[in-house]
């Protein structure tokens, strides 16, 4: 939830900024020259298609791609999980996309929450000015730096930062992207997690659909309107097929082709693409630490291991994302 009301924002600003909160689909991912940032799916009004006690089914005519986009959010009895499916029909060509939950860490003391993701091939800091001082924006991570451990990410000053501890580095705005390892029999899904005070939030995905995870680390580094240095302690933990948050035109240039990492997907007018994720919460004991693994524990259940060695089980149909 952004620290401003929609009515405080200039009419010229994108709708997305006016109501910045929660979780939203980005199709395509990133800014566009002649359309709103992150696409109509993140800015336009959705229609109610169907609903019920445990289902919300929404739809959207996308004027930019010509696609019919559906969002299905489902709850299941006895579970603390949201099953999210996006169906995209009628699009043609290569598009980037992503799911964009924004987690609010402002209730946590500095550095006390723990953020982690499933094993990744490599990580990168955005290779340019994600936060440009010309626009009164400031970043602290070393542009373009590659890393293999979120606890050791190069700073522009020469030291390393531990990105698993948050909130941290107030006054800065940074973007990193991790390329997930492919699925195995033992690890059929990829995951992201944030451990808070007594509970954790986690998401599950198919790495073939969402090959990368982006962390948008937003802790007061933007000083132009509507940010005004007050968007503190937030983090977008975003599952994407994109090149960072660059435009779809840049993603179509395959900037990571040499690494074998797709940044767009081919859509065909005569087919429907289904993109599925699960977001869930679970209680954790004190001193659980950052999540080090989330693996299947049989059908309809996962076991989550913390840095302390403690484990918790959560009822989640992980097969939904495969």
Predicted regions located by residue number:
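Asparagine-centered strand-capping/turn motif at beta-strand->loop junctions
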Residues: 86-91
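Surface-exposed acidic/polar loop and edge beta-strand patches at domain peripheries
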Residues: 1-83, 94-322
